[in-house]
Amino acid sequence: MPKNIVFPSRKERMFGWIYALLGVELLPYILNFICSGVGITLTGSQLNLAYFVVNFLVVCLVFRRFWVRTGKAVLDRILWCVLMAAAFFAVYLLLSQSVGRLIFWLKPDFANANDRHVAAIADSYYIPTLVCTVFLVPMTEECLHRGAIFGGLFKRNIAAAYAVSTIIFALVHINWLVGDPFVILLSFLQYIPAGLCLAAAYHLSGSITAPILIHMAVNAIGILALR
């Protein structure tokens, strides 16, 4: 286990907190406003893809020094990162299956609304959706949720870092849902295994590379299953 975890700087973490809690929610409205202002009409799917790309570019720009530090450090621990990614990917699969069985027992007709949303986008733009969900989204979300939020709390309280980063990660994926509160609760529960395993992979590998690899693998399984 590496002695030092590569975290974003204090300024990067501050931006990450603000952007994860506010910017991510406001960006779709900002994009829509800009497109309307210049006379461009986008479908819902096109707007979502634009959202993924702009989100990624903003995070890359702000966290550019963090990416440089991560790139330098990962060369010394690449095998350990891959090992941790493989280990926690396996743990995620086990936990996810267990939670899935519980959800099926509680509500046999449950379906993940976020998955249906991505499937609808992929139905019209499969390759762009694959690129965004497998590559851009994992790098963006890991920078924000593990790098900024988990990293911002880690030195103060490790348990809080795990709990808060996992809860916010889950909420971001369901905050647009409306309807049956029980279904929303089950949707929230579905993201807990991923949040915990991604945080643990970052903690024990010492590099954001490990959770990014896991996140990419999970999303790849989901998007390839749509083919």
Regions found by a protein language model. Name each.
Residues 2-23, 65-97, 101, 154-160:
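Interfacial transmembrane-helix boundary/kink motif in multi-pass membrane proteins
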Residues 13-21, 44, 48, 52, ...:
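Residue-level signature of transmembrane alpha-helical entry/exit and packing/kink sites
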Residues 17-65, 112-120, 128:
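Alpha-helical transmembrane segments in multi-pass membrane proteins
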Residues 24-32, 51-59, 88-96, 165, ...:
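Alpha-helical transmembrane segments of multipass membrane proteins
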Residues 26-50, 101-106, 177-183, 220, ...:
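Juxtamembrane/transmembrane-helix boundary motifs at the membrane-water interface
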Residues 60-70, 201-204:
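Structural signal for the C-terminal ends of transmembrane alpha-helices
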Residues 124-227:
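Transmembrane helix-loop-helix hairpins at the membrane interface
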